[in-house]
């Protein structure tokens, strides 16, 4: 019940919803969501948290007298498609149970699809090209996933959305190029026998910029 809807399938849904006028608002909310927020404010409140798999059954078991299965399913479907909820998933926040305890990390595929959908919605409201920001977020999601570049690219590849595939490829290429630069800088630093401050000055870098690049390279080495 908590699987996030892929951005590719939501494009047509969103366009259809936009044409239904007053029905749109009704579909974006459900009276049961207010009740869920009272019962579990840490999950359904102003700052939603990713829900554990099986939360539907947990809610029915805990609130059997108050909940109807069909209404709960409708409410959860609306909730897990909301931008606030998808933003939490896109951040890679852990999935939580009804007690608010973190129980598992979202799957890399869910994080990636949430990123695409959140940025698609933001781009519709913004004149700014959000592509560069999305590519950076995809790169960060890849690096946090623990997958190799090829495995991540294969897992996130869409059979229908070539625009998303192009964005994915560009993000991974940019990230790989930056990682290569960081690694080269770290090797040069290690061979220089200089302090980080002196090394940054020698290369014309701001000390904080050099420190961040060296830290990224060390972190990347630790993953290999």
PLM regions with names:
Residues 178, 211-224:
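Short, solvent-exposed alpha-helical "recognition" segments
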């Amino acid at each position: 019940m908590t699987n996030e809807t892929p951005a590719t399938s939501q494009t047509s849904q969103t366009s259809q919803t936009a044409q239904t006028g007053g029905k749109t608002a009704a579909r974006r909310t459900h009276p049961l969501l207010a009740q869920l927020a009272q019962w579990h404010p840490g999950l359904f409140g102003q700052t939603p948290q990713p829900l554990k798999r099986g939360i539907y059954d947990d809610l029915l078991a805990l609130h059997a007298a108050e909940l109807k299965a069909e209404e709960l399913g409708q409410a959860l479907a609306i909730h897990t498609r909301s931008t606030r909820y998808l933003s939490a998933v896109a951040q890679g926040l852990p999935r939580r149970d009804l007690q608010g305890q973190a129980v598992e990390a979202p799957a890399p595929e869910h994080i990636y699809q949430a990123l695409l959908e959140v940025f698609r919605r933001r781009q519709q409201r913004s004149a700014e090209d959000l592509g560069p920001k999305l590519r950076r977020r995809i790169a960060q999601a890849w690096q946090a996933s623990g997958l190799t570049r090829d495995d991540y690219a294969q897992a996130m590849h869409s059979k229908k959305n070539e625009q998303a595939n192009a964005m994915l490829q560009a993000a991974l290429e940019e990230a790989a190029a930056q990682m290569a630069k960081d690694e080269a800088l770290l090797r040069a630093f290690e061979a220089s026998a200089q302090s980080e401050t002196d090394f940054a000055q020698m290369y014309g870098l701001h000390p904080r910029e050099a420190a961040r690049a060296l830290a990224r390279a060390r972190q990347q080495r630790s993953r290999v």
